[in-house]
Amino acid sequence: MAQVDYSTSSYKTPLHHRILAHMPVVASWVDAESGETINVEGMTENVGESSTLVNLETLPPVGSAVRLRVMEEDKTIIEVSTQVIRVERDPSKPLAALTVLENLKKWKSTAMTAAEAWVTRHWQLNYEEEWVN
């Protein structure tokens, strides 16, 4: 009988890590109609190895180039060029999925490390919450 190995190494499927961290960002892009530069502040929902999901009040069009600055205590920790690959137009939580186009090694080391640090600072266990069954 044949043995099937389901490990990721046998399939060569890359593992992509995402860290759920809410870090402040500033996104800027040029509006195609007016030619004006739009600057919007927002928060990350998650940070991945080559992408991020950000909550922005004004969403850029899919396919547009966005300059993204990830902030920490009012200073920029990394600034990269990104491209919008998907938007979610939920009025209560508008989201844009951005893929990083440059400096992937720096993104992985800087943004991922900052996201891990954010989680460490904000991770709290609350054992006093009531459980709903």
Give the location of each predicted region.
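Structured alpha-helical
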Residues: M1-N133
